[in-house]
């Protein structure tokens, strides 16, 4: 698994800024999809009040997608062949994963490799390292047709649908 060092700032006594934590982010797999890794880097649930403590909430309490006003900061690793249908595989399983719609605006940055964005109208756009995507809550899917692993970071901002 790809590790990520995560440095989190916070306010200590007297509201003086400090490093609240410095360590590895939690990385998990995705059931049924070997090679997919999700690093949950940080999350907020909105509410309008800034929590400058730098104390991480238990990520197991958070839904993957944020509520309105909430955010999720994730790094996702996509293995070669992700989102491409193996002729012997259950096609509906790939279709469910490939195309999805969320009540979020997602800001993404490709860090390594390439991913192909697939939209309902059949259009596709291939993103490479350094490219950015603003995904505005529309149905979309991802494919990695390259022979190398793709890595992207996303900030998901929750909205009412």
Q: For the regions a protein language model found, what residue spans apply to each?
A:
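Ligand-binding loop in jelly-roll beta-barrel domains
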Residues: 68-72, 116, 124, 128-131, ...
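Double-stranded beta-helix
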Residues: 6-12, 16-21, 27, 145-161
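A short glycine-rich, His/Asp/Glu-containing loop-to-beta-strand
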Residues: 20-98, 104-105, 159-160
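Short, small/polar residue-rich loop motifs at catalytic or cofactor-binding pockets
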Residues: 3-5, 102-103
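Short, electropositive, low-hydrophobicity segments enriched in small/polar residues
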Residues: 14, 39, 112, 117, ...
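A short beta-strand-loop-beta hairpin characteristic of the jelly-roll/cupin
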Residues: 93-102, 107-128
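Short, surface-exposed charged micro-motifs
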Residues: 7-8, 107, 141
């Amino acid at each position: 698994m790809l590790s990520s060092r995560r440095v989190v700032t916070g306010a200590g006594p007297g509201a003086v800024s400090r490093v609240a934590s410095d360590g590895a982010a939690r990385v998990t797999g995705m059931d049924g999809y070997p090679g997919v890794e999700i690093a949950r880097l940080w999350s907020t649930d909105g509410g309008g009040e800034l929590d400058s403590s730098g104390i991480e909430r238990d990520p197991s309490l958070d839904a993957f997608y944020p509520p309105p006003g909430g955010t999720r900061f994730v790094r996702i690793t996509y293995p070669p062949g992700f989102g491409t249908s193996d002729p012997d595989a259950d096609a509906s399983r790939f279709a469910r994963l490939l195309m999805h719609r969320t009540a979020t605006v997602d800001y993404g940055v490709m860090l390594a490799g390439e991913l192909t964005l697939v939209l309902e109208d059949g259009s596709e756009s291939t993103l490479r390292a350094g490219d950015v995507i603003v995904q505005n809550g529309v149905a979309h899917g991802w494919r990695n047709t390259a022979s190398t692993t793709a890595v992207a970071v996303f900030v998901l901002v929750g909205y009412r649908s």
